[in-house]
């Protein structure tokens, strides 16, 4: 993988990730394909929304169908018939989500398989081996996603263990002869000094890109913005920056304004299945009665298949009847909305008009633009 920085506007960056499997224009949003599928979508449909890279879930694909089934097909690209690049998370966040079902030790994490209750062990080395078999174009190191809230002492211990696991991940990745990209994950909760130590340690190890982890786990938005404003300028300029598990459309805009290149989140697909649809002016909750006789397009400014062909009333009808087609049409739209948003952000950066774009984006929602930190505003 190669990263090219094309242009900047303040802290925001317009670039591209170049893989053997294709080019990803950044800032980019990655739809989440947890089990080797973006729920309800064929790979062709996902590509038609404008997505150039997907996220797969190491933890879930390891438990089901497993490495051996994957290898029978070749790798995850062959298994799910997605020809473009794939990033896989390491399993750290899923282990974090298990709560009391897991025990974190220096050697790795012991937990019960959520499918059948059998004992399972996942380590940095095992995560690298699984992702190698998946053929991931971007491999994530195995880390502990520090919970929120966490006091400074706990966050320090967690961050230091993640650094040790980062070294082990790097070593096993290299031993396997993996020629794809390996990203480090910056931890440290909401504490700037711990984030500094984490980033310094990761840069010393050396990675192809750097993710900001441990955010969007319950902390106030102000803390997320503060950490991004602090960390992003210190990440090597020639490496991509990835904000994990984020997020809402507003979060994408704010992440881009602060220098983030890559995002992922289940929100567009999960919300679509629940009738929560993103449109130019905000959100449409399509199951609400006000849309029963609404013959207009879901979003007149959207060019997706759903908006070009169906009315709000029809989508309301499908939702009320729990028809599978409703979930699919909603998903097509939400994914396209996110990709259109990213394309607009890229264009705004190229034209040096990102702050004007942000003002329009929030103005359509009846809101004001959140302030940047002093350093970001000055840049």
Curated annotation (Swiss-Prot):
Which Gene Ontology MF annotations are present?
A: metal ion binding; tRNA-guanosine(34) queuine transglycosylase activity
**Annotated segments matching region RNA binding:** 245-251, 269-273
Which residues does UniProt mark as catalytic?
A: 89 (proton acceptor), 264 (nucleophile)
- Pfam families membership: TGT
Q: Which cysteines are joined by disulfide bonds?
A: none
- Reactions catalysed: 7-aminomethyl-7-carbaguanine + guanosine(34) in tRNA = 7-aminomethyl-7-carbaguanosine(34) in tRNA + guanine
Under Enzyme Commission nomenclature, its number is 2.4.2.29
**Species this chain originates from:** Edwardsiella ictaluri (strain 93-146)
HAMAP family noted in UniProt: Q_tRNA_Tgt
Q: What quaternary arrangement does the UniProt entry report? A: Homodimer. Within each dimer, one monomer is responsible for RNA recognition and catalysis, while the other monomer binds to the replacement base PreQ1.
Q: Which residues bind Zn(2+)?
A: 302, 304, 307, 333
Q: What is this protein called?
A: Queuine tRNA-ribosyltransferase
Please give a single GO biological process term from the UniProt record: tRNA wobble guanine modification
Q: Does the keyword Transferase apply?
A: yes
Record's function text:
Catalyzes the base-exchange of a guanine (G) residue with the queuine precursor 7-aminomethyl-7-deazaguanine (PreQ1) at position 34 (anticodon wobble position) in tRNAs with GU(N) anticodons (tRNA-Asp, -Asn, -His and -Tyr). Catalysis occurs through a double-displacement mechanism. The nucleophile active site attacks the C1' of nucleotide 34 to detach the guanine base from the RNA, forming a covalent enzyme-RNA intermediate. The proton acceptor active site deprotonates the incoming PreQ1, allowing a nucleophilic attack on the C1' of the ribose to form the product.
Q: Which GO terms describe its cellular component?
A: cytosol
Alphabetized, the UniProt keywords read: Glycosyltransferase, Metal-binding, Queuosine biosynthesis, Transferase, tRNA processing, Zinc
Task: Note how many cofactor molecules are bound and how.
Answer: Binds 1 zinc ion per subunit.
Q: In which pathway does it act?
A: tRNA modification; tRNA-queuosine biosynthesis
Q: Which residues bind substrate?
A: 89-93, 143, 187, 214
Q: Which family does it belong to?
A: Belongs to the queuine tRNA-ribosyltransferase family.
Enumerate the cofactors the protein uses: Zn(2+)
């Amino acid at each position: 993988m190669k990263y090219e920085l094309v242009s900047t506007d303040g802290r925001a960056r317009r670039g591209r990730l170049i893989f053997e499997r294709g080019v990803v224009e950044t800032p980019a949003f990655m739809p989440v394909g947890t089990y080797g599928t973006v729920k309800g979508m064929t790979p062709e449909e996902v590509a038609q929304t404008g997505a150039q890279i997907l996220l797969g879930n190491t933890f879930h694909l390891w438990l089901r169908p497993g490495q051996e089934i994957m290898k029978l097909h070749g790798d995850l690209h062959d298994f799910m018939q997605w020809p473009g690049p794939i990033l896989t998370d390491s399993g750290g966040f899923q282990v974090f989500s298990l709560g009391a079902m897991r025990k974190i030790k220096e050697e790795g994490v012991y937990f019960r398989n959520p499918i059948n209750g059998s004992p399972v062990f996942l380590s940095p080395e095992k995560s690298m081996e699984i992702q190698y078999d998946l053929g991931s174009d971007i491999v994530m190191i195995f880390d502990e996603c520090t919970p929120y809230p966490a006091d400074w002492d706990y966050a320090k211990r967690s961050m230091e263990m993640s650094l040790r696991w980062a070294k082990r991940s790097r070593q096993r990745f290299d031993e396997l002869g993996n020629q794809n990209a390996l990203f480090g994950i910056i931890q440290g909760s909401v504490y700037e000094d711990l984030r500094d130590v984490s980033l310094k340690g990761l840069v010393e190890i050396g990675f192809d890109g750097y993710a900001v982890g441990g955010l969007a786990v319950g902390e106030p938005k102000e803390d997320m913005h503060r950490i991004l404003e602090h960390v992003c300028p210190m990440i090597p300029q020639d490496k991509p920056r990835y904000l994990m598990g984020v997020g809402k459309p507003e979060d994408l805009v704010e992440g881009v304004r602060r220098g983030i290149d890559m995002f992922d989140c289940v929100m567009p697909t999960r919300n679509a299945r629940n009738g929560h649809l993103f449109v130019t002016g905000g959100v449409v909750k399509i199951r609400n009665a006000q849309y029963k006789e609404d013959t207009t397009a879901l979003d007149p400014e959207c060019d997706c298949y759903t908006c070009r062909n169906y009315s709000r009333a029809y989508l309301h009808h499908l939702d009320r009847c729990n028809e599978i087609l409703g979930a699919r049409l909603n998903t097509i739209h939400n994914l396209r909305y996110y990709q259109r948003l990213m394309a607009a952000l890229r264009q705004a950066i190229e034209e040096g008009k990102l702050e004007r774009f942000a003002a329009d984006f929030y103005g359509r929602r009846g809101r004001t633009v959140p302030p940047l930190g002093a350093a970001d505003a000055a840049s």
